[in-house]
Amino acid sequence: MDHRAFIAGLTASQRAGLTEKSNAKGLAGLALHFGLIVLVGGLIAVGVPGWQFLMMVQGILIIFLFTLLHETIHRTAFHSPLLNDRVARLCGFLIVVPSDWFRYFHYAHHRHTQDPDNDPELAGGKPDTVWEYLVHISGLPTWWSEWKTLFENASGRCETSFVPVNGRDRVRREAVVSLLLYGFLALVSIVSGLHLLLYVWVIPSLLGQPFLRLYLLAEHGRCPFVANMLENSRTTYTNALVRKLAWNMPYHAEHHSYPTVPFHKLPDLHSLIKEHLNSTSDGYTAFHADYLTNLRDVSSKS
């Protein structure tokens, strides 16, 4: 069974229940995620013992706002479209992934999942050697790509196929405003001599990015280049803490099969679809152990 046949087999009441959005559940998740960021940031700011270690915790919390950004650009985090768009813009700003541009990018990824010629997530390929793997999870290529894209968009040189011509002015304005705000915050920090943002935002984000790279690689890494979402996307079985941090996106095959299902309904969808999943892993450690074993320069020595 492929994902289309599965969705076609759902009853009208099942579809209605699975796609029901909730401001309350979204706001509860938002309050928890940002509440932890403010709490940990406050502990770093006052210099509690071990505050240096807390920068990594802060970084993981901040960089995993990517998963909330992802949920909001689908407009499934909240029932309110305006709330989705405002939160998306905030999350995108904090992690240097502008929300309007990312919506175009991500929708192209959904239309062409695991299509080597059209899926923008496959641009540049996946790591195939130990060195490529280490560089990938460092997050450095990601930061380079994000800042490069931001400057290209701001200059009006956004010519990627997934951004429609009538959307390019919007993407450009978003990039210009973002760069102006980043510049303003940097200037205020330098002039005032206060380095708070460096320790509660910038350095933590650098420390947190590798954890997001490790997480995201499991979503489609080593999945086949086919159209069936039950094969080309991976569900990773993990603990409740990771699912909460990632807004239930470890249920990734479920999300790709039925993208209009909000994060809080994905466990329900999983219970219905789990017997048909073809790409799963028993945790992120298991996934990466298998991935490393099958890297080209590792497997050739076995």
Predicted regions and their residues:
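Non-catalytic, topology-defining segments of multipass membrane proteins
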Residues: 1-61, 93-198, 263-302
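Transmembrane alpha-helical segments that form the membrane-embedded catalytic/substrate-channel core
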Residues: 59-72, 98-101, 143-149, 201-227
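Histidine-centered catalytic micro-motifs
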Residues: 65-75, 102-114, 215-222, 245-261
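C-terminal membrane-associated helical module and adjoining short loops/tails
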Residues: 162-221, 233-240, 247-249
